[in-house]
Amino acid sequence: MNDTSITLHHSKVTIAPGSVKNPLCVVAHYLFDTLCPAIFQVEQMKLKEGLISVGSKRVEEPDPLDPEIIKRFDNHFKYDEIDDDYYATEDSDAPHFRRILHWYRDHFGSSPTGASILLPIGALRALRRLTAFSDGRCIVISGDKGNNNPEQFRGLMDPHIAEHGSFSV
């Protein structure tokens, strides 16, 4: 997500910003819910960042690399208030991320039920870097889970963790 170039394994060719002459076609199957989503809640005009602590339901895991450990995850969420400049240290995406967060705060801030939001920050960063290879010329075809109606975000709740041999939020 943070690399600005890709070196192809077999040909050893490096793809860097501006090096691709034709537009890219990115097929993003389950990309948006997999790459580091950011968790937020809006409650009484305040933005809160969601933080997750992941552990096991067992006191001790004999093999922490056992793939079956996913079935024993014991997740705990904590929400801390953030200020308006939460993404101030971001690169050129900072103003866009802030604008998105502020829209949700303004839209849901006076709602008695609040709202819970997942922003696909990791996927957006990855797409920004991919489109830089072809000077911003790109089509993205995405098949993913998610909501397209802001009203579906109403209510303060923890995100659903989907288990499917791995996990996604």
Regions found by a protein language model. Give the residues of each.
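Conserved nucleotide-cofactor-binding alpha/beta core module
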Residues: 1-3
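Class I S-adenosyl-L-methionine
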Residues: 9-169
